[in-house]
Amino acid sequence: MKVVLLVCLVWMMAMMELVSCECWSQADCSDGHCCAGSSFSENCRPYGGDGEQCEPRNKYEVYSTGCPCEENLMCSVINRCQSA
């Protein structure tokens, strides 16, 4: 019984964390983050660092798999951040 309660508690904490990071637009995210994901599970994610997955910046600020790169980096044709 204790194990079941512990699992439920951990699950609830994980769900609360996911909900607290949800976003509807870029304005919902703090500096250094973008709103990315599918239309049902968008959340604030950090901008890509050197070698990390990225999506090119776009005028609509809509990203599905990842954020654009951090400043001074560019998103390559293979969707990885690299030096500009």
UniProtKB/Swiss-Prot annotation:
The keyword Cytoplasm does not apply. One of its GO terms (molecular function) is toxin activity. Expressed by the venom gland. One of its GO terms (cellular component) is extracellular region. The keyword Nucleus does not apply. It is found in: Secreted. Residues 1-21 form the signal peptide. Keywords: Disulfide bond, Secreted, Signal, Toxin. Pfam families: Prokineticin (PF06607). Its main location: secreted. It comes from the Eukaryota. Disulfide bonds join C23-C35, C29-C44, C34-C67, C54-C75, C69-C81. Belongs to the AVIT (prokineticin) family. This is U8-theraphotoxin-Hhn1g. The lineage of its organism: Eukaryota, Metazoa, Ecdysozoa, Arthropoda, Chelicerata.
